[in-house]
Design a protein with these regions (language model features):
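Sec/Tat signal peptide C-region and signal peptidase I cleavage site
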Residues: 5-8, 13-17
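N-terminal alpha-helical modules
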Residues: 16-108
Length: 108
């Protein structure tokens, strides 16, 4: 599984910048993500995994994933500019997405 995620990150055009336009960053969390390489990398990793997984599921589950992502983004905003809080938030979300991926039945 790690290899699949790695390939997705390498091949993704998002792998060089945050998943949003840093020139338009307004909230404290967005500004810190854009200025911190580790947070920027985690943002890209989370975004790639989220969009990959969302594309695998039918509308019902895809809608639930969208709702879950929206709720997570609201929670992330509560971190404001706290780097430690943002790191924990991203790691927790990536862990959730990894667990969801592991639930998918895969061919050999």
């Amino acid at each position: 599984m790690k290899y699949l995620w790695f390939i997705l990150l390498i091949c993704s055009p998002l792998s060089f910048a945050a998943s949003f336009d840093c020139a338009k960053a307004k909230t404290p969390d967005e500004k810190v993500i854009c200025s911190n390489l580790k947070l920027n990398d985690l943002d890209v990793e989370m975004s790639v995994k989220y969009h990959f997984l969302r594309g695998l599921f039918a509308m019902g589950v895809s809608g639930e994933m969208y709702d879950s992502q929206t709720a997570w983004l609201k929670q992330r905003q509560k971190c404001k500019g706290d780097t430690t809080c943002l790191l924990q938030s991203y790691r927790a979300r990536i862990n959730q997405l990894d667990k969801l991926y592991n639930l998918i039945e895969k061919p050999i």
